[in-house]
Amino acid sequence: MAKLKLDIVTAERSVFSEEVDLVVAPGIEGEMAILPHHAPLMTALQAGELKAKIGSEEYSMVVSGGFLEVRPDRVIVLADSAERAEEIDIARATEAKKRAEARMADKYEPGMLAAETEASLRRAMIRLKVAEKRRKRPSV
């Protein structure tokens, strides 16, 4: 069966680099599935869960923005930030969520700060969701 080379990188490090069967990414128009021999494309990513399947194993990562380039045999993700599910610090993500919720409750926060706070809350919730899914599954 044909495979795709998936590379996920940030400015600081390479997060994931493997041959995979399927990539599911959070594009700005919604979730997109990419199989080998997909038509070339380039798109922006929104904060969300990025999944990669290798056989019956599924790997989850959290990406916070960036770009995704698809070639027929390769997917390259240049992410603003990215972390594998097993790297997520649940206590830190829970604290970030609480801080964002407290800021959201502040009705005097100007519009731009409110948008940043919503984005922070969304990232924290995604990180917690991905970490929780990993805890419920057997180790990969």
From Swiss-Prot:
Gene3D superfamilies documented for this protein: ATP synthase delta/epsilon subunit, C-terminal domain (1.20.5.440), F0F1 ATP synthase delta/epsilon subunit, N-terminal (2.60.15.10)
Family: Belongs to the ATPase epsilon chain family.
Highest taxon, organism lineage: Bacteria
Protein name: ATP synthase epsilon chain
InterPro entries recorded: ATP_F1_dsu/esu_C_sf, ATP_synth_F1_dsu/esu, ATP_synth_F1_dsu/esu_N, ATP_synth_F1_esu_C, ATPsynth_dsu/esu_N
Disulfide bonds, paired cysteine numbers: none
Lineage of source species: Bacteria, Bacillati, Chloroflexota, Dehalococcoidia, Dehalococcoidales
Keywords assigned: ATP synthesis, Cell membrane, CF(1), Hydrogen ion transport, Ion transport, Membrane, Transport
